[in-house]
Regions:
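Short, flexible, basic/aromatic active-site loop/helix in glycosyltransferases
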Residues: 132-166
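Short aromatic/hydrophobic "clamp" motif used to bind/position activated sugar donors
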Residues: 83
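A conserved acidic beta->alpha catalytic loop
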Residues: 22, 36-47, 63
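Conserved donor NDP-sugar-binding/catalytic core segment of glycosyltransferases
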Residues: 94-128
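Short, acidic, metal-binding catalytic loop of nucleotide-sugar glycosyltransferases
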Residues: 21-31
Length: 333
């Protein structure tokens, strides 16, 4: 078996049907198997997939334990030399998967490959090329170039040997040898959702190069997000679950100091955010608490983030999944 394609399903059977259909249409040069790990099984919802693609292996999880745990179950069952972790809301439209495997075969120094994300009109989705680009956006700082240059100067320097090399693969498409995935320690099961791909990329980059190539691309439809942000502003721009996962990645990859520095940034911003609003309201003849929804929402989110500090610092095995009442973005809809 050349390739195992692993999907994590969460109410995405319709996307998955069309994705698998596109794979059989465009992946004809390699033997491959498809494994689906279902985090939210609805009896009968997968019938059209299993009827048309009866060789699909379908594993049902007892609970929705997140992306990493599901991927690891698929990885354990994989028989292919190569494994491709692929989102259900994607479509193959050319020979990109064959091209990706060819790159791995020809360049053994590469540990894993990503793919460029295309929209339906085949224009590219923007994404974070490097981990420093993502780390920079975790801070709440003025957008003036002086602050941005200062922040970049404080982050560890990133050195890439070619235009294709990166240290951050987007988890919608990650291809590697199965033995490479196992050697890196597989997916970190402390992550529930989000940022697990960045953390995994960090460990994979210690084994070999991570790359994007122009001839490896997939359409990414970007399905529904149960942690969609609401009431977005420059300061209040983080989803709680996404930010918990981002902070976990920082803690695991860069240590407790890097994690605490980001939280300190938020702690400094909070009173300033309130004071600015008070002054603004007074100058306009409004009451102090007029239109302070964003300040209140930001305060509530920080309360949740700070409540996880003990677990983040100790880092014992723990699934960092927020409680329903902590999903403030959903509650605000």
């Amino acid at each position: 078996m050349d390739l195992t394609i692993i999907f994590v399903n969460y109410k995405s059977e319709n996307y998955l049907y069309h994705c698998i259909q596109s794979l059989y249409r465009h992946c004809k040069e390699r033997s491959f198997e498809i494994i689906v790990v279902d985090n939210f099984h609805v009896p009968g919802a997968n019938q059209s997939i299993l009827t048309e693609f009866p060789k699909t292996q379908w594993f049902i999880q007892d609970t929705n334990s997140g992306f990493s745990i599901a991927n690891n179950r698929g990885l354990a069952a994989a028989k292919g030399k190569y494994v491709l972790f692929l989102n259900a809301d994607t479509l193959a439209f050319d020979n990109s998967i064959e091209n990706a495997i060819h790159h791995l075969e020809q360049q053994p120094e590469i540990a894993a490959l990503g793919a460029y994300q295309l929209q339906e009109d085949l224009t590219r989705h923007p994404f974070y090329w490097s981990q420093n680009q993502l780390r920079k956006d975790l801070y709440i700082l003025p957008s003036h170039p002086i602050f941005q240059k200062l922040l970049f100067s404080l982050l560890p320097k990133e050195h890439f040997q070619s235009a294709e090399e990166t240290n951050n693969l987007v988890g919608f498409f990650m291809l590697m040898k199965k033995e490479t995935a196992m050697r890196a320690g597989a997916w970190d099961e402390d992550f529930f959702l989000y940022a697990e791909d960045v953390e995994f990329s960090n460990r994979l980059s210690k084994i070999g190069k991570l790359c994007y190539f122009e001839d490896v691309q997939m359409i990414h439809l970007v399905g529904n997000n149960p942690f969609r942000r609401t009431k977005i502003s420059f300061v209040n721009r983080f989803s709680v679950q996404i930010q918990i996962s981002n902070l976990l990645w920082i803690r695991k990859s860069y240590g407790s100091l890097a994690y605490l520095i980001i939280l300190s940034n938020y702690a400094i911003v909070l009173p300033g955010y309130w004071i600015w609003k008070f002054i603004n309201n007074i100058s306009k003849g409004k009451s102090l608490l007029f239109n302070t929804e964003n300040q209140i929402l930001f305060s509530r989110k920080l309360f949740v983030l700070f409540s996880y500090i003990p677990k983040m610092l100790i880092l014992k095995d723990f699934l960092f999944q927020i409680k329903p009442e902590e999903n403030i973005d959903l509650k605000e809809k």
